[in-house]
Amino acid sequence: MKKVILSIVSIIMVSFAADAKKENKAVTYNENGEIIKTGINLGPLPVVAFDADRGFQFGALLNLYNFGNGDTYPNPKSQWYIEASAYTKESAINSYKFIVNYDNKTLIPGVRMSICTGYYKDAALDFYGFNGYQSNYDMSLIEDNLFFSDDKSGENLAEKFENKGKLPKGFYRHGRDLIKIKADFTGEILKNFYWEAGYSFSWTKIQSFIPKGYTVFPGANIGSDYIGTSLYDLYKDWGIIPEDEANGGVVSALKAGLMYDSRNVENNPTEGIWAEAHVIAAPKWLGTSHSQYKYSATFRQYVPIIDEGKLTFAYRIAYQGTIDNSAPWYTMPFYTNMGIKADNDAFGGYRTVRGLMLNRVQGLDVGFYNAELRWKFIDFKLWKQNIAFALSAFTDGAHVFRGYDMSFTDEAKAKLLLKDPVTGVAKAALYDKFVFDRKDGFHASAGAGLRFIMNQNFIVAFEYARCFNKQDGSGAFYINTGFLF
């Protein structure tokens, strides 16, 4: 926490230093009493964050805002976001990412351009299966079939389990490398009503997770390597994940949509409506490995309860569906965004449903919601910066409305037994333990948060959420940036 506070102080000081280098210019205020920012505002700072799903995050980022002559403040005319960071969990670096985003409203007359690029590496990405509660999450079942190795890694894990009751979750993990590039364009049709068009490219490579120091379900793999198995590997064995999709692939997609946006402030809205509807087409002739066609709709509203943004009720309702009966499994965790933000990774976690385990909800058609009260309890000026603190109380939820085909067909069973009768029987017997004959239920959570807000754009969030069903996880704490919506 001390590191986070030091980071906030450093960003204020850097912004103040940048302002000090400008010519002595009279400070001007808008109708809300805020200092109108002009020119380039820099926000370099170390990344110090925490995500319950990925662990402690460290690295560096740069926020660069161009307010020009200030006539559009608090909305910048253009902005850059650059980040290089990594996550460490259990004293090991499990994932890292490199991101460069650029947004410009003036380069092309009448058109807003947003470009997002990123490389993401996850050595141990959460995977809990498809269709929500149809996939059983049961750590007690893992505990009964987990064996620690005799080496130092195994001894350390065994000690943690004995002293803290902490079980390794490698059974519910796989590895992933991901490259994402997108370019989106927005233009006004009528006041507050816009067209949207864009192109996105992603390359995904999936690998099995190889645990160190322990084995899960060793009876399912009695080979000389004795590495046990994982849910991802079992899904391949059961034929739920097709062979040609198992290792990932390329998605090359065209996007089109409409947007209504009457927000008063883009990054910290206190009133207005922001609604979007999109169609996404990724045919094979465009270079896609496995064609897919999707649609999405999102409605967000910000209702002022007390004037001047003191108290706001905000909510988001979102739905994403598949135009067909199938889609590549490795694309299901993503929810399409258009604009400066990259596509949300996973239904569950900080950007979609707080408290819910990352990737817990996956299906062909998925919906989710967020509802929260935001109370800006103090605001002041410090070193020529507009500073505010806000509290929030929220509830989030998600549901799979149409599921992915989870059948363990006779053909898949015969193929599994033919490959290796001994391990095949063991793996086939595990199907009924992890895939239930039921539809998804409602996943929900509730929590609260605190935010530091500078110049209506740079926002640091501290949030805690807890799920109502242990199948979705327990409590989750996050330190991150911005509002969810």
List each language-model region with its residue ranges.
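Transmembrane beta-barrel architecture of outer-membrane proteins
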Residues: N41-G43, Q57, S95-K97, R176-K180, ...
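Residues on the lipid-exposed face of transmembrane beta-strands in outer-membrane beta-barrel proteins
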Residues: P46-V48, A60-L64, V100-N104, I181-G187, ...
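Gram-negative/organellar outer-membrane beta-barrel architecture
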Residues: E34-L42, A49-V250, F347, Q471-F485
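Short loop/turn motifs that connect adjacent beta-strands in outer-membrane beta-barrel proteins
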Residues: K21-K22, T28-I40, G68-S78, T106-M113, ...
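Transmembrane beta-strand segments that form the barrel wall of outer-membrane beta-barrel proteins
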Residues: N41-A52, N75-E90, F98, I273-P283, ...
